[in-house]
Amino acid sequence: MVEKNFGHSCSWININSEEINNYSTIYQTYQIDKEMVEYALDENERAHIEYCRPKETLVVIYNVIKQMKRENRYETVPMTFIVRKDQIITISNRHNEYIVETMRKELEDRPNMSLFTFFFSSLMMITENYFPKIESLKKEQELVSLKLRHKTTKKNLFALSDLEIGSVYLVSATKQNSIVLEQLKTQALFKALEFAEEEKLENSLIEAKQLVEMTSINLQILQQLSGTYNNVLNNNLNDTMKLLTIISILLTIPNIVTGFFGMNITVPLTGLAHGWGIVLGIIVTVIVIASVVLLRFIKK
């Protein structure tokens, strides 16, 4: 647990969600109701805001990107912010506790900031932590693309698929965050903010929108690559099937030619000593002619 005072009689309290599991009195002490606790403990909770006017309490669920990959892709986890008159409570877990350290350092550097400046700065810090991961994914995507150009293997295709799936999740998470910031501007409390606090929220929103655009472009590129290689694989499969069809047709020619000699009728060349050689030559000639005709037909 983290407890820090800052600004003019403001306080920040961070509670680890594992502590809430083990010590139920924590959320009672800080007057955190059961619904807020459920939000904090649900790792699949979508980013959103809620404002309780009677209690003058703002609850914000914001998506934080995990530091480590899972199944070769980055995922996000929600972090809960509870903002009151002179108090901000965050509920974190092991996946987003690195943000808590960043927030602690921010307060050490700027101990006199206001409550909402600290709150909006924290949201911006969360957004900024996405950018290095997105840049890393772009480099990884370029590397996978080069490998696929060199050789289209299952391993490389699975790597491309993982990147695409991960990007879908990131686009969804960043869009949710951007919507949350947009909704904050519509709240009644926004009108009571000071100019510096409004500016901080605006800057946070600009960063969030840039992140949405960046992740969306990255996803579009991955989808284009995936579609291109799907077409290439389909064309390769079609070419293979055409080749197998030609081979199947050509393999029937010897049976057709030699089949005449198994009939109880008079067939030319049967009385010649080297008749088998002539028959073989006929078969080869027919196969060559059929090959040329079939290849020209398929190319059309």
What does each of the following model-derived ranges do?
Residues 28, 209-300:
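Hydrophobic alpha-helical transmembrane segments and their immediately adjacent juxtamembrane loops
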